[in-house]
Amino acid sequence: MTVRTRFAPSPTGYLHVGGARTALFSWAYARHFGGTFVLRIEDTDLERSTPEAVQAIIEGMEWLGLHHDEGPFYQMQRMDRYREVIGQMLAAGTAYHCYSSPEEVEAMRERQRAAGEKPRYDGTWRPEAGKTLPAIPEGRKPVVRFRNPTEGDVTWLDVVKGSITISNRELDDLVIARPDGTPTYNFCVAVDDSDMKITHVIRGDDHVNNTPRQINILQALGATLPHYGHLPMILGTDGEKLSKRHGAVSVMDYPAQGYLPEAMLNYLARLGWSHGDDEVFSMEQFTQWFDLDHLTKSPAQFNPEKLDWLNNHYIKQADNTRLAGLVRPMMEGLGAQFENAPDLAAVIALMKERVNTLNELAVAAMLFYRQPAADAALLAQHLTDAIRPALAQYVEQLKTVAWSKEALSATLKEVLAAHKLKMPQLAMPLRLLITGQLQTPSIDAVVELFGREVVLARLGKNL
């Protein structure tokens, strides 16, 4: 059997975190077995589906690197196929025309509720042997209903939840085509899964109630049933369902907030799946390890601090030139002055250890790309008359010293020893004069990156 999985979002909004996790698990399972990952856009909800949402979903998948092998397939482009199958089902007797009006169906359900029964279609127009159907109302267009079995159960072994059984008595004769002929959600999904030969359906557990309906339709079509796995929801840190109030829930919010895709993928992989105590792993490792046996049944909790920790790890591991390309546009928005400034990749190498996001990295790197504006009171506090002779000697020696971190460090120590000063006594005024800030990386590294010309110019103004 060739494994074929699918990710089938409805384009009614952004690609959210839960959807991205579903896509990741479906993608990884196909990759693990050398199978095929299909992208299908379920866009039959014409009132809510938008081209912008389709684009947002595709952009989110591309940012994460979850590349599909087939598709994207759009349900709205498959209407002829759905109508063909509906015609076949009507001819086979597995579907029928129903002329009950919406008002009649609602009245029927109200009577059932009043009697303490589960609301369901009562089968008025369902053909049965020896049954006389009502006269067709003049001018009324019918819906098409699926002839659901009235006896027995629907049972499947869910790869996450275990065995699930639903009585057919709990299921309705589902409307599979509206009066205008447009097919409905569960019918389209079943036909698509059959036509696309999907072997494994991995999706959120909000679809559990759809599964028995889709199974019955697939069986009526004589199709091979896929394996189903329903992932538990993702919760916020307060134990409630993840929502906007917990912060970013759209995947494309995360690059805007300075997260790397590899950090997001690593984090999503651990939301409901585990491989021993492994916390950090590449996507190559993940696809080698991933299986459905280690998916958890209980809801996963989204922890922003854990995501930050992973992002810090991947920022530290990332190529500095790549990071420079990502943070430069952010810094331009902050007013960075790149002319006659240090190499950005070199600055990032120095600054990236201390940050959790690219946004933080951009802010930190601005130290090297703006004019210093030290607070006058701080300057008066740290640049005292007792320090000025040492500063003057340091400036003089900077004019000829070899420009390396090691040589600069030796020069600074030599000046400190000559004037019997401790490191902070000279390093603090140097930081203020060169950067305008008291908190910087090692003063030797800062001096080296700024370069001889800039450092001498900024220090010379205060001699």
Swiss-Prot record:
Its main location: cytoplasm. A motif ('KMSKS' region) lies at residues 241-245. GO terms for biological process: glutamyl-tRNA aminoacylation. It is found in: Cytoplasm. SUPFAM superfamilies: An anticodon-binding domain of class I aminoacyl-tRNA synthetases, Nucleotidylyl transferase. ATP binds at K244. It comes from the Bacteria. It is an enzyme of class 6 (ligase). InterPro entries: aa-tRNA-synth_I_cd-bd (IPR045462), aa-tRNA-synth_I_codon-bd_sub2 (IPR020751), aa-tRNA-synth_I_CS (IPR001412), aa_tRNA-synth_I_cd-bd_sf (IPR008925), Glu-tRNA-ligase_bac/mito (IPR004527), Glu-tRNA-synth_I_codon-bd_sub1 (IPR020752), Glu/Gln-tRNA-synth (IPR000924), Glu/Gln-tRNA-synth_Ib_cat-dom (IPR020058). Residues 115-129 have a biased composition (Basic and acidic residues). The keyword Metal-binding does not apply. Residues 115-136 are annotated as: Disordered. GO terms for cellular component: cytosol. Monomer. Belongs to the class-I aminoacyl-tRNA synthetase family. Glutamate--tRNA ligase type 1 subfamily. Catalyzes the attachment of glutamate to tRNA(Glu) in a two-step reaction: glutamate is first activated by ATP to form Glu-AMP and then transferred to the acceptor end of tRNA(Glu). This is Glutamate--tRNA ligase.
